[in-house]
A protein has these predicted regions:
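Extracytoplasmic metal-acquisition and chelation regions
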Residues: 2-17, 22-330
Length: 330
């Protein structure tokens, strides 16, 4: 009897030990699985919302695989007219960061004010915005065209500055540095990568700026006509002069007086091309060009980008080629 009890005790002990080992193995497996999930979660890219394409471009180049960047302005849409759905506002509030230009899009300004994520990057502090009046052409007339109610609203939104800084790659370089520093602060574990990529992007933008300046240094003509005056920063950088059919806001309609001034300038200066834009109706420009016996071509302000095969730098190079052809550059 004692032997039987002794054997049973050993049997119970063995079963108990086996169970303990099994539980330990399960616990270890669960712990490993939990650690793997935690590691995978920590490796997930940071969600970043950019207000429009040029800022999306910079942020993606700087963040690389560490970020998942989405533009609040849909591809092919006019950013001046942006309205945000409740879903987009919610996505913004849940993002790791937002990159925007304060004063350019009132819907974004309001969303950031009311639903800001932890990291807010306002590039207006680094890109040296210029007073709008400095980028008005010499042809601006008193009535500045017949503006729609919507155009007046946009004019109020933009305030007294020209928002189109991204058409000067040197200013894009400054924005790259700011974005890199902000992302590094938001994600310290990858700070070195952000700063390295920002420095590389800055160098690329500075090289592009030099290419624009050198490529337009020897041109027969120095004036170019555009649909609206979005190219002031590019003109400043290259020493050229833009003459816009309408002002900074694309919704303003050129007055008869403005069109006459453009016509007179084209004849007097030997201008051969009126530039249109992808996102604006070319009707007025094409009609005027036909009346004057000259051509039209596209000069892209890169406010939005629907063609995934071309990025900011590629479009800027196309803009340079278009200018060189229109201005008879060497």
């Amino acid at each position: 009897m004692i032997i039987m009890i002794f054997s049973r005790s050993h049997t119970v002990f063995a079963i108990t030990a086996a169970a303990a080992l099994a539980l330990s193995a399960c616990s270890s497996s669960a712990s490993s699985s939990s650690s793997a999930s935690s590691s995978q979660a920590s490796a997930s890219p940071m969600k970043v919302m950019a207000s429009f394409y040029p800022l999306q471009y910079l942020t993606q180049k700087i963040g690389g695989d560490l970020v998942d960047v989405e533009s609040l302005t849909p591809p092919g849409a006019e950013p001046h007219d942006l309205e945000l759905s409740n879903q987009k506002v919610q996505q913004l509030s849940q993002a790791g960061a937002v990159v925007y230009l304060k004063g350019f899009q009132s819907a974004v300004d309001k969303a950031v004010e009311l639903n800001a994520p932890k990291t807010v990057i306002d590039v207006s502090s680094s890109v040296d915005l210029v007073d709008a009046e400095k980028h008005e052409s010499e042809l601006d007339v008193a009535d500045d065209g017949e503006k729609t109610e919507e155009a007046h609203e946009h004019e109020h939104e933009h305030g007294s500055t020209d928002p189109h800084f991204w058409l000067d790659p040197t200013r894009m370089a400054s924005a790259a540095t700011q974005i890199g520093d902000a992302l590094a602060q938001a994600d310290p574990a990858n700070a070195e990568t952000y700063k390295k990529n920002a420095a590389s992007t800055k160098s690329q933008m500075e090289a592009l700026s030099k290419k624009l300046v050198d490529g337009t240094a020897k041109c027969k003509h120095k004036e170019f006509v555009t649909s609206h005056e979005a190219f002031g920063y590019l003109a400043d950088r290259t020493g050229l002069t833009q003459l816009g059919l309408s002002g900074l806001d694309p919704d303003s309609t050129p007055s008869p007086a403005r069109l006459k001034q453009i016509s007179d300038a084209v004849k007097a200066k030997g201008i051969t091309t009126i530039f249109t834009e992808e996102l604006l109706s070319p009707k007025v420009a094409e009609t005027l060009a036909k009346d004057l016996g000259i051509t039209t071509a596209v000069l892209d302000p890169i406010e939005s980008q629907a063609d995934d095969s071309k990025d900011y730098e590629a479009v800027m190079n196309e803009n340079l080629e278009a200018l060189q052809k229109a201005l008879s550059c060497e």
